[in-house]
Amino acid sequence: MCDDSYDAVEEYYFNKSVAGISGQENWNKQLATQVYSRSLQPEILPTLKPLSCNKERANAGKRVSEEEQINGKRKRKD
């Protein structure tokens, strides 16, 4: 009994698609899983290094603020 609707090529591709995920699709699925798992982990940010400051400039700023407190006035910066 041979059924006219039976197609060997269709059965081959159907079995191939049902049998498992192809290599590329499997790789994409693994990559998506890795990206998702990384997104759940806290992000490690690089630590900021302190800026090297000029001591004279820092001291001058302190002097100006002390003078402002004493005089009660604020100097305009042009």
Curated annotation (Swiss-Prot):
Descriptive protein name: Uncharacterized protein YJR107C-A
Compositional bias ranges of the Basic and acidic residues kind: 56-66
Phenotype on disruption: Causes increased sensitivity to osmotic stress.
Region (Disordered): 56-78
Organism of this sequence: Saccharomyces cerevisiae (strain ATCC 204508 / S288c)
Lineage: Eukaryota, Fungi, Dikarya, Ascomycota, Saccharomycotina
BP GO terms, sorted: cellular response to osmotic stress
InterPro entries on file: DUF5137
Pfam families in the cross-refs: DUF5137 (PF17220)
